[in-house]
Amino acid sequence: KVEKLQSKVLNEQREVVVQLPKGYAENPDKKYPVIYRLDGAGNLTMMNAVLESLQSQNAAPEVIIVAIENTDRLRDLYPTANEDPNGPVGYGGGGANFLSFITTELMPIVEKKYRVHDFRVIEGASAGGVFALYALSQKPELFNAALTYSAAVWWNYGASAKSTVAFLKSANHLDHFIYTSIGNEGAPMRPYYNDMISGMRANQPAGLRWENEAYEGVTHNLVSAASTFSAYHHLFLSAYLRPQQFSGDIKSIKDYYARVSKQRGEKLDAPEWVIRELGYHYVGKQNYDKAIALFKYDIAEYPQTPDAYNGLAYGYEQMGEYKKALESVNQALALSTSE
């Protein structure tokens, strides 16, 4: 759906394309996270292909996409005017106004007309990547994540690289996600980008999830295509906690699903089989104490589910604790026959 609005901040008419999830009309009570995609609806085909693949595996939620069309791209997406002769001198500097347009004019319309919850992502490439980093640093209370592809941080002698590092350095804790990537960039881009990555690594605050990837041999204009799957895959938490994501602390299961719930705007708990599979994983590693603790936690969460007791029985059997295994099997049978 195309939304047109007359912006008082920018003093011009702006156009955005709002794409709703396929099941939007069939789920009138459901709310969705929002991706604000810079550089317009030309990105929707690629975004949809990646998101649908992830959604088919429950590895990403359904989302509302707000694709913002350009009018004066350099003006809007660069926060500072460029003084570096490697680029167009005097261009840029309208980022603050553009951010104000998004947060004070566009967002209120989106949140009034559509069923959204408060998990918001800002995503962009090149100049759009610069703006996404800027938006997160200026409005961390509004954006939960910034996805940036080959962000043109060389602009104005690396102003964006420096401000991004300064933002992270000033943050004691940041419960956000940042994705950065780069292709086969040379000068003037690469030195500023490398400095930014080094600074981000040295000043990464507690709580920040950050992924950085380099796609050597991939040109600047193809980095978005190379990065989109990885960015979404790292950003969105699967509804199914995998063993490699499990810290080993049972409390972390609830913490993980609290974060999944925050992303998806609905309360999600660990499915019974997910907890049981974690137990099986530790049986396979012969870490029986951890496995038994997980199986017992599974029973505590799902006391009326026979399979939870079967998991515990399996753990005890592998330990050679046959009496305890038999007790668990009998509990599973009792529940099965009472159903």
Regions found by a protein language model. Name each.
Residues 322:
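Beta-loop motif signature
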